[in-house]
Amino acid sequence: EGEVIAMALDLMHAEAVTDGEPVGMVTTGGTGSIIHALLAYREHAAKHRGITRPNFIKPETGHPAFDKGCHLFGIELRKAPIDPKTAQADVDWVADNIDENTIAIMGSACNYGYGTVDPIPELGQVASERG
């Protein structure tokens, strides 16, 4: 496990981290990985941004493990509607629903259930603009 984590940290340029020591973990599947990611987002936002009432935004088509993780960790879940023709996340809705307590947004490539790809570049732009 340690060797795999070391390789992953190398691939992700962990040496560039300046505000702590990079770490990693191996999980047993997608649901566990998603749940651990949400916990990491929550804890990071609490420590670095002082967020005590976190929220997370995902498209309606996002994996249900995000719903479970938000429930387990007391994170408000905001579900973005999808375009009925493309089954992609509504980027304008996401932008309108981000606030100072948003710890992360997500998009899928490809999404759970439909197999379509959310507009990742546009979601990334919204995330960059909103911090």
List where the protein language model places each region.
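Conserved PLP-enzyme active-site core in the AAT-like
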Residues: M25, G29-G131
